[in-house]
Amino acid sequence: MILDFNFKLIHQIFDLNCLPESAEVIFLGWPDLVVSEQLMIELYGDLAEQFRVENNPVPWARKDGELFDVHTVFQHHNCNLTIIDVIKHRGVEEFLDLNEPLLEHFYKRFDLVVDTGTLEHCFNVGTAFKNMCDMVKVGGVVVTSAPYSRPYHGYYNFVQETYTDGFGTNGFEILDLICTKSKKMRVVLAEEFFTKIMPGQGILNCIAKKVEDKKFTWPIQRKYSK
């Protein structure tokens, strides 16, 4: 699911104009775009109404926000979408189990890889992270979010070093790394924040660009590698 804070991160990529024309984009899991009408109007003006899903196929009444058509929105940005999952929710997904080694035709294929909350549900999370990195071309971007302090949400909670070490060891430059607690909260990462303040229901969000083609290696946590 893509919520306001996820879509703001994704939209940073559009604003930076770092995607080629006809960009290849992959979503890890079905991306229901459930965002506020206010945000869509802010980003798209009168076009926002064209993106709305009138007959909502999923009961998202428990979520704040409206459902917008992710295909129409990304087509507006000249993106070709691939959606992978282990369940065919809509019938258009390609089956891919991120717990397993990546299939050859997914390697270095995508300009943008979007994970808005899938990796923490993969039991073999290290392999899933590796697969995410291996999917993106050099010059491409990963946008990923995972729980920082949400017990019982998935199998795992992440820490900032998951991204600084995982991406930093494997040829990526981190463009943004933040913690969100709600749609209205944006906290820049700092040692004091993470050592002294534990945000309830905190979510880590990272944008990383692949700047070098490197064979993936398992990182060693930096505080132990010195």
Which residue ranges define each predicted feature?
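A short catalytic or substrate-binding loop motif that flags glycine-/basic-rich loops and adjacent residues
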Residues: 1, 75, 198-201
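Class I SAM-dependent methyltransferase Rossmann-like catalytic core
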Residues: 1-23, 32-42
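Short amphipathic alpha-helical segments and helix-helix/interface helices
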Residues: 10, 14-16, 70-74, 129, ...
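Conserved SAM-binding loop
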Residues: 24-28, 65-152
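Aromatic- and Gly/Pro-rich amphipathic surface segment
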Residues: 33-83
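Short aromatic-enriched loop/helix-cap "lid" or pocket-rim segments at secondary-structure transitions
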Residues: 37-41, 94-95, 154-157, 188, ...
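Conserved Class I S-adenosyl-L-methionine
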Residues: 153-180
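Core SAM-dependent methyltransferase catalytic element
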Residues: 186-226
